[in-house]
Every structure is written in structure tokens, then in C-alpha cells.
């Protein structure tokens, strides 16, 4: 990927988060539980994953959360659903890597892989728990600003590195 594209998409999606959160302020969500999602809303939210696949520097989770909020899903349900969507994506990516390596691992490599998976799982659970608690009290504007600052820092780094 071109670093300029990644930096620009970081900034653009940061701005998109700020715009969506400002537009959404004071509005009441229409969907308050995952059980209320329809096939149509699931299809729309899932389609937002394509944005992340097409544009490097775009967060898959961020894209699906924004898509969900835009169709009236509450922040907590949007984040929860996004994390559920990640399971098949990550499982598929991991399975693809295993197939690519032909399942040929030494005992030491298999142990390292297992330890890495366990640590990643525990850290993911803790991170999701923290994020869900944060989302219940805050909007995603901080994430938008983070993306803008990170994108600007990436641009600045490569300008100064010349």
C-alpha cells in the first residue's frame, strides 16, 4: 500500500467519525439489541467491511461501526455486532495462513503458536470489555481525532524523512 493513501484514509475516516457523531448527537437509536437487526441492516453493515478491504488505512471495525450508526443502530450494539463480525473474518484469515504454511510446524513452533493464540484471545477479551465500557459513556469522537492525528503524524514523518 502507498503510505500516502493510508495516511489520507486515516484522516478522512477520522473526519467521517466526527461528522457522523456530530450528525447523530441528540438522536435516539432505532436498534438497541442485536436481536433487532434485520437481514437488510446486517447486509448494509457487512457491506461497510468492503470499504476497509478496498481502502488501506481504513479500520474494518470503524467502517462497520459507522455503517451501523448511520442506519440507526446504537453505539453499543454497533460495536458488539462489529466484534461478532470479526470472528469469522479472523478465523478465515488464520485458517488461510495455516493452509499456506501447510500445517508444517515443529513442536516449538506449535507451542509458540498456541501461546500466541491464547495471549491474543485474552488481550482481545480485555480490550473489548474496556471498549464496551467506554462506548456506553462516550461517543467515537476521540477515535476520530486519534485517526486524524495519526494520519497527520504519518504524513509528517514521511515528509521529514526525505
For each predicted feature, which ranges?
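Multi-pass membrane proteins that catalyze or facilitate reactions on polyprenyl-/lipid-phosphate substrates
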Residues: 1-162
